Amino acid sequence: KQACHYCDFHFSTSLKSKDKLILALIKEIELRKSEFPPEINSLYIGGGTPSLLNEEDITSIFTALKKTIKIDFLREITIEVNPEDINLKKLNFFKKIGVNRLSIGVQSMDDKVLKWMNRIHNKEQVLKGINLAMRSGFYDISIDFIYGTPEFLKRNYNQEISEIIALKPSHLSCYHLTIEDGTYFGHLEKNKKLKPLEDAISEKEFLWISNKLKSCEYEHYEISNFAFKEKKSFHNANYWKQLPYIGIGPGAHSFLNLKRRWNISNNNQYIKLSLIHISEPTRLELI
């Protein structure tokens, strides 16, 4: 769709090579079948906007995964969704294939902030999307929220967080805005057109958010994560416990046998390598 001004992850706004990319993903799953641990408790479908994929695309990926892991026995299957992509047809399909948790990229409940970030959705779409998801039977919903934005935006965190709490998501991930080289915000900062928020102010914002969430029965269980009791993310916990995980796709990371590996962060090169049966990492690091 379009790039958020803060995004430093690998992404593509073009869908021209989507079909080839799906085939390459499936091929990587097949090539790395022997690497998958015997017991897996979670599956996370992320990478930005997987909700853009159609039913046929996702079904193809799940069919390949079912040949490798026991999907029906997974405790947690999460898919990232943007608010503007949520509709009843898509939600019913997610349930059909076994998805039991949604991670929704809300980021803010203030339309002016969303526009400044170059997000496509607005507050109304957040409210409609999350309410529809819950009415459809998705009660395990995680919301991504960004704080630490420049002072000129004059955000009302009390209002924003209160509106999110009113939706009763089971989980929140609160991330500080980071301004990275190579992003639009990074370009503005380099040219002295954007001043990052002072650390002391950011710390106060996070402390306030943390206390507010704790007062509403959310447990602060990791650096950026809050959840209702028994709703902590299995997938997140695996990272913190340094359990093995496998990342599939361009730019994906894996951690196996005390080794970290990075897939190449270029769609065309990833497709080329996967389709000629090569699954070597761009980078390998021994821990």
Regions found by a protein language model. Give the residues of each.
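C-terminal scaffold of the Radical SAM
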Residues: 11-33, 39-275, 279, 283
